[in-house]
């Protein structure tokens, strides 16, 4: 249960009970009432601004109104104290019996605790990575891959119907260049001395095996074909090889997509999908023939001083109208974006999320304009921009490219430090803030390494379970039996840990609503810190140890508390795509 939603309902019921009405008649607007944890935990367990946001409507001083509401809330059987603070905040302290009851509910829910129905009925498409299939993934792709993947996992946990999608950019000029680059490697594999790779082609050694496979399969037959036919075949084989490489890289990072959508699909049958999308916009009055004035600065590729087919994107929020078709009848890249969005919308998605690099900031307004025009404003579109990742080693910057001139790849990073540190640390800053990734920091065993600190808490939980088996003979812990003794949990430090656990459902919903998966990483660190602190208290004070051999009932109660900590850590780490270890190796 989300205790804050519970008390939101209780507070609104209290407002009805005291017959609070607006001075001008009608119904009170309760939408601005907030119920959340106080910024300072010493002030209580629940804080609300109800009196402050309603005072003007009811014509009463905020503090006086707060006193009136507080007096009514004090009669709630679960409330221990109610205080009015500052200009009219109301702080509630809840009884230990309430927290004991909530802990029992958490234990009963197990790893489903925190799961929400918030997104029930909403079908969401999360598109992320979508790297060009021209080579292995470099470290710059890593952050967007993790942010998109964890956001999708989070939304699923919050009840949304989610599809993870990768858009394969396999129809552009860069693919023609790639095919010519592989053709060169094919000739090399046949024994030809190709010399230096010509400027403009892809020089990477990762194309050598592709050329070798072609030589093994076809011998010299490709050289005997018409060039266009040979290049078409090479293009298909190369895209398959590059996507296999990319999928393997993503698999190493535990990133898995449900759908791989080929851009070339939009261009089949004389680009029927693109033509249909433009026709739909035309029928809605969003397309016209005209010229665009030359923009200031460097001219974009799709600008020409001739009449073109244009999208009236300025009418739906964009800065300028966008070309859809050039004067020679060729479609612009943007026309493909329109068709792709329409394809998603036609598949039944009412919300589309794009996770892009910060260098795609200029695409945001045009994508939003497309969403409004294609869906008549019915579809929601969100673009998350991921800022750069800077690599460090012991505080010293690491060059992003090797001596060979190739970029450090995603696989290089994962192979050196492991999947879990990469995934967790890519979330340890909000996506729109630059992130520093230190190879040494993410592998050290200290509190300063968040992923170690959180996973160590998980391992410590299981250490407690093993101690229970050794010292109490409890190899199989019974959740009902543990919950039966929660009335033994009365120490303030234990109740404080229950409070932190109780924040999890609210955290899940807030992170899903605001599409901010980094909140989960922060919460898990805070929970781990609270658990480690409780462990240390037991080291300093034997009365607070999780296992007291001479008091089996109290031990069972504390084991139940540890079990819920373990459940939440496992749940959160699973959403992040990392392991919840039972022991540290």
UniProtKB/Swiss-Prot annotation:
Short motif ('HIGH' region): ranges: 131-141
Entry-linked PROSITE patterns: AA_TRNA_LIGASE_I
Gene3D superfamilies per UniProt: Arginyl tRNA synthetase N-terminal domain, HUPs, Isoleucyl-tRNA Synthetase, Domain 1
Recorded catalytic activity of this chain's protein: tRNA(Arg) + L-arginine + ATP = L-arginyl-tRNA(Arg) + AMP + diphosphate
Entry's EC annotation: 6.1.1.19
Cellular compartments per GO CC: cytoplasm
Record carries keyword Transmembrane helix: no
GO biological process, one term: arginyl-tRNA aminoacylation
SMART domains: Arg_tRNA_synt_N, DALR_1
Keywords assigned: Aminoacyl-tRNA synthetase, ATP-binding, Cytoplasm, Ligase, Nucleotide-binding, Protein biosynthesis
Transmembrane segments: none
Alphabetical list of SUPFAM superfamilies matching this protein: Anticodon-binding domain of a subclass of class I aminoacyl-tRNA synthetases, Arginyl-tRNA synthetase (ArgRS), N-terminal 'additional' domain, Nucleotidylyl transferase
One Pfam match: Arg_tRNA_synt_N
Location of the protein in the cell: Cytoplasm
Source superkingdom: Bacteria
One annotated GO molecular function: ATP binding
Principal EC category: ligase
Matches recorded under InterPro entries: aa-tRNA-synth_I_CS (IPR001412), Arg-tRNA-ligase (IPR001278), Arg-tRNA-synth_N (IPR005148), Arg-tRNA-synth_N_sf (IPR036695), ArgRS_core (IPR035684), DALR_anticod-bd (IPR008909), Rossmann-like_a/b/a_fold (IPR014729), tRNAsynth_Ia_anticodon-bd (IPR009080)
Assembly description: Monomer.
NCBIfam families referenced in this protein's UniProt entry, alphabetically: argS (TIGR00456)
Family: Belongs to the class-I aminoacyl-tRNA synthetase family.
Protein name: Arginine--tRNA ligase
Organism from which the protein derives: Brucella anthropi (strain ATCC 49188 / DSM 6882 / CCUG 24695 / JCM 21032 / LMG 3331 / NBRC 15819 / NCTC 12168 / Alc 37) (Ochrobactrum anthropi)
């Amino acid at each position: 249960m989300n205790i804050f939603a519970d008390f939101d309902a209780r507070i609104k019921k209290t407002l009805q009970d005291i017959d609070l009405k607006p001075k001008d008649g009608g119904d009170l607007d309760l939408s601005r009432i907030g119920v959340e944890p106080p910024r300072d935990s010493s002030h209580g367990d629940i804080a609300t601004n109800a009196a402050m946001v309603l005072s003007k409507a009811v014509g009463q001083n905020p503090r006086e109104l707060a006193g009136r509401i507080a007096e009514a809330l004090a009669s709630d059987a679960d409330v221990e104290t109610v205080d009015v603070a500052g200009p009219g905040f109301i702080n509630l302290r809840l009884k230990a019996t309430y927290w004991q009851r909530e802990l029992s509910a958490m234990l009963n829910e197990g790893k489903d605790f925190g799961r929400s129905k918030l997104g029930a009925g909403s079908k969401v498409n999360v598109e992320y990575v979508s790297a060009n299939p021209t080579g292995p993934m470099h470290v710059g792709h890593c952050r967007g891959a993790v942010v998109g993947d964890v956001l999708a996992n989070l939304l699923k946990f919050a009840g949304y119907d989610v599809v993870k999608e990768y858009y394969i950019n396999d129809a552009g000029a860069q693919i023609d260049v790639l095919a010519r680059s592989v053709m060169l490697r094919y000739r090399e594999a046949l024994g030809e001395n190709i010399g230096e790779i010509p400027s403009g082609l892809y020089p990477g050694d990762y194309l050598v095996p592709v050329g070798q496979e072609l030589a093994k399969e076809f011998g010299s037959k490709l050289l005997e074909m018409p060039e266009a036919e040979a290049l078409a075949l090479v293009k298909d084989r190369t895209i398959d090889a590059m996507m296999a490489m990319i999928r393997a890289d993503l698999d190493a990072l535990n990133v898995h997509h449900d759908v791989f959508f080929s851009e070339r699909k939009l261009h089949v049958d004389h680009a029927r999908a693109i033509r249909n999308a433009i026709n739909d916009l035309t029928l809605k009055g969003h397309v016209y023939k005209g010229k665009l004035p030359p923009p200031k600065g460097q001219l974009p590729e799709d600008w020409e001083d001739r009449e073109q087919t244009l999208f009236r994107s300025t009418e739906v929020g964009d800065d300028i109208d966008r070309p859809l078709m050039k004067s020679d009848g060729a479609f612009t890249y943007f026309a493909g974006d329109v068709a792709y969005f329409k394809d998603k919308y036609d598949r039944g998605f009412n919300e589309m999320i794009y996770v892009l690099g910060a260098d795609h900031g200029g695409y945001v307004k045009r994508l939003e304009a497309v969403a409004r025009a294609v869906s008549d404003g019915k579809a929601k579109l969100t673009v998350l921009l991921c800022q750069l990742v800077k690599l460090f080693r012991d505080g010293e910057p690491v060059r992003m490219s090797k001596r060979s001139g190739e970029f450090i790849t995603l696989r290089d990073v994962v192979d050196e430090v492991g999947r879990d540190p990469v995934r967790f640390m890519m979330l340890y800053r909000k996506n729109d803030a630059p992130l520093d990734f230190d190879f040494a920091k993410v592998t050290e065993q200290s509190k300063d390494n968040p992923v170690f600190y959180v996973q160590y808490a998980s391992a410590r939980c299981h250490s407690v379970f093993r101690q229970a088996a050794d010292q109490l003979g409890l190899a199989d812990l019974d959740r009902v039996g543990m919950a039966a003794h929660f009335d033994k949990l009365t120490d303030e430090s234990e109740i404080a840990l229950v409070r932190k656990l109780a924040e999890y459902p609210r955290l899940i919903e807030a992170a899903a609503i605001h599409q901010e998966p980094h909140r989960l990483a922060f919460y898990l660190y805070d929970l781990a810190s609270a658990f480690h602190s409780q462990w240390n208290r037991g080291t300093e004070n034997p009365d607070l140890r999780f296992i007291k051999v001479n008091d089996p009932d109290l031990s069972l109660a504390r084991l139940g508390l540890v079990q819920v900590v373990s459940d939440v850590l496992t749940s959160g780490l699973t959403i992040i795509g990392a392991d919840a270890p039972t022991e540290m190796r």
